[in-house]
Amino acid sequence: MESKESQSLHVEYYGEGEKTIVFIPGLGGTTRYWSHGIGPLAERHRVVLVDLLGFGASPKPWTRYSVERHVAELDAALASLGAITLVGHSLGALLAIAYAARHRNQVENLVLIGMPYFGSEEAAYRYLRSGKVKWGFLYTNVLLVMIACILTRRVFGWLLPYVRRDIPREVAEDLVKHTWRSSTSSLWEVVYRYDAANELRRLSEQTQILMIHGQDDDIAPFAAIKQLADEQPGSTLIELDGLDHHPFLRTPHTCLTHIDSLVSGDRP
């Protein structure tokens, strides 16, 4: 039996504003994915950064990293914060939806950045095996993903800052802060098998939804997000021309401006 009492997600707090904004990173991400860019936001609001279970400085138990388990751990960390705006990137965006659907009275706003949505596990496999994503087929084989995780963490991890020059050094360094179990289980349970569209429909009409997505995102296809946004009442889609899967890393000022406007009630 797992001791839930022994689990405690790593959480960082910045600023002391009236509004609280919680940032959830994607697969392999940590608080350092956000920390370089949230300074201006923390001058006006209380900003909370969290490492998901199995990643970063949070515990990494041998468990099934299901949507329900992730949400339960987030609830233990966030329940005392009162009303919040949830900002999630990639897998973190999917978990933000899941959390909001189960805590509709707490989550006032949702910001979904680079969120992957395929509709089903089979559709995800078809897309990743289509050749549109470099080495995409690898992410559809749990054994290959497991081997890649082990080799990266134990052998080649020190090379990541030199290989992944498209992202900040600290973000690349933290890509090894997980286990093969937390990585593979989260990928399959959350990205491939979770029905985000159905959960979006469960949200309160008062929940404001902001989607920020790069039009050149090959990991999370833009067309699927465009369709979701069109079907979801009260949602706004910010289309970023020429950007990939990491809008917050490429243009943090743009992302922060939209987030601040949403939280402050300044959206047109």
What residues fall within each predicted segment?
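Flexible "cap/lid" loop of the alpha/beta hydrolase fold
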Residues: 101, 109-142
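Short beta-strand/loop motif that positions the catalytic acidic residue
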Residues: 203, 211-213, 217
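Conserved alpha/beta-hydrolase "acid-adjacent" motif
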Residues: 218-224
